[in-house]
Structure formats: C-alpha cells, structure tokens
Amino acid sequence: MTTQLDSLRNMTVVVADTGDIDAIKKYQPQDATTNPSLILSASALPQYAPLIDEAVAYAKAQSNDKAQQLIDAEDKLAVNIGLEILKIVPGRISTEVDARLSYNTQATVEKARKLIALYNAAGISNDRILIKIASTWQGIRAAEILEKEGINCNLTLLFSEAQARACAEAGVYLISPFVGRILDWYKANSDKKEYAPAEDPGVISVTKIYNYYKEYGYNTVVMGASFRNVGEITELAGCDRLTIAPALLKELQENSTALIRKLEYKGEVKAKPQPLTEAEFYWQHNSDAMAVEKLAEGIRKFAIDQEKLETMLSAKL
C-alpha cells in the first residue's frame, strides 16, 4: 500500500518539524527543523538530560561569568540536539538564532558563525546545517552576508510576498513561508471560520511565492511550514520542501488516498526585477496587517521560549 507520505516524498522533500529523536527515527525525513520552542519541548524529554548536562559543563569550562555561561549553554544545547538529529537524518538540520537578535544584523551574523563553529568542531560540515533567522529586513541582510561566507540560511517567520522577494534577491538558500499561522490570523480577524484547503489563505500565500520564484528563476528553496491540517499539506504537494510536525506525518502515513501534484511551474522564466529597496520592503510588508502582526508575534513567542530555556539552564549553572 502506498501511503500519502510515500507519494509526497516522490514530489517534495519531506522535513520533520521537531526536535524529538524518536519521531524522526519513525518517519525518516530527509531534513529536520528546530526552533526555540521545539528545543524547549525536547529539553523536557528524559533522553535529552545528558545533552543538557554536557552543554552546562561546556559552558562552565568556557567562562566564569554567569551571563556568558548562560549564552554558551544555550548555544551548545541547540547544537547538541542538532548533532543527535544529524545521526538520523541524511540531510540538514536547521538551528535557529536567538529571536531577540532579529533586528540586529551584526549580532545575528556573529551568533550564526558561533553556531557553525560549534557544529564544525563536532565534525559537521556546513553543507549539513541551515541557520534559521527571522525574515526581518535586518535578518535578511545578515543572511546575505552569511551566504557569501558559505553558511546557508533558512529564513523563517515569513508571511508576506515582500519578505519572500527580499530573501530571493539576497540569495538566501531556503525560506520557510508559514501556512497555518496565516490561517489562524484570518480566522481570528474575519467572519469566515472554515476554509477548504484550496481556499486556505496560507496555502494561497505559499503557492504565490512558489510560482513567483519559479517564474523569475530564483534558486531559493521554498519550504512550506506551520501546518494546521493535512489538507494544507496535500494542497502544496510538489512544493520544493515541506516541514511537517510528527502528528501530521502520522496522518499522512496512515492515509492511502491518492495524492495529486498541485505545485509545478511550467511557464517561461522571466528576467528578474530590480531588487527591493529597504523603503519598498517596509512599505509593501507593512501594507499587509497579517504579515506585520504575525512576524512580530512569532518573534515574541520564540523569545519567550528562549527565556524559559534560559531559566531552566540557569538553575543548572
């Protein structure tokens, strides 16, 4: 029996959106993505206790300053979890930069270099790592610098066409346009509470971005993210990559209904437009209330979970 997950793998690279090693072993994705919230969840699992202890010991060996120890322990824990995941997935791990640096280009670049150095010291080459950065103007500029250094980036919390366009123009390796969080916003801010998959505003957004990239010949990978239901996933079959939480991977694995490719660009490739200026980026992005609110909210939520992680680690330092 061919499952929907098998069918999806034939047209899209399937990525696991989790830090849970057991789930990754079960569904055998090509890549895996983590974020501060997923690192926090994973840290509560008993099998991760040794990784936390090792990160704390590492931090204590680096510095006597408590504040610096906390930063070092956070970074090392994220990398330790990434290293465990890389033992299972054949492809890449996405590890996220502290969301509180989202509006600071230089600090983002420095944090990314540090994370890469930790991976490199553990014997992992750059081609197995993606550095996750929020798709702010400052984050996109940081990614532009990092890509030129051979550090590939995954630009996340992407909700607007302006963000997608700026990422492609900066030569970013991969973007993660969010689907479910866009749906959440429309449900909360309009009278319409139910959407068929094909009319789901998150699905429509990713479809537009995918077609725009193919139409203008951008090489940036489109990886749909943040799914609320299987319908959103099947409607985006054919997207370059999709990062999917274990519960939805399970549903896809248990369903054998035929899957039809929905995304495939067959038109001609056009000449690329002039890159957006900073002013144009802000005007276009800020014209979309959903994108403005969801980007800010996403950064706040990741920062809150980063602080919870710090509380847990500081008790051990």
Curated annotation (Swiss-Prot):
Its main location: cytoplasm. The active site is at 132 (schiff-base intermediate with substrate). Pathway: Carbohydrate degradation; pentose phosphate pathway; D-glyceraldehyde 3-phosphate and beta-D-fructose 6-phosphate from D-ribose 5-phosphate and D-xylulose 5-phosphate (non-oxidative stage): step 2/3. It is found in: Cytoplasm. GO terms for cellular component: cytosol. Pfam families: TAL_FSA. One of its GO terms (biological process) is carbohydrate metabolic process. It comes from the Bacteria. Transmembrane segments: none annotated. Its EC number is 2.2.1.2. Belongs to the transaldolase family. Type 1 subfamily. This is Transaldolase. It comes from Haemophilus influenzae (strain 86-028NP).
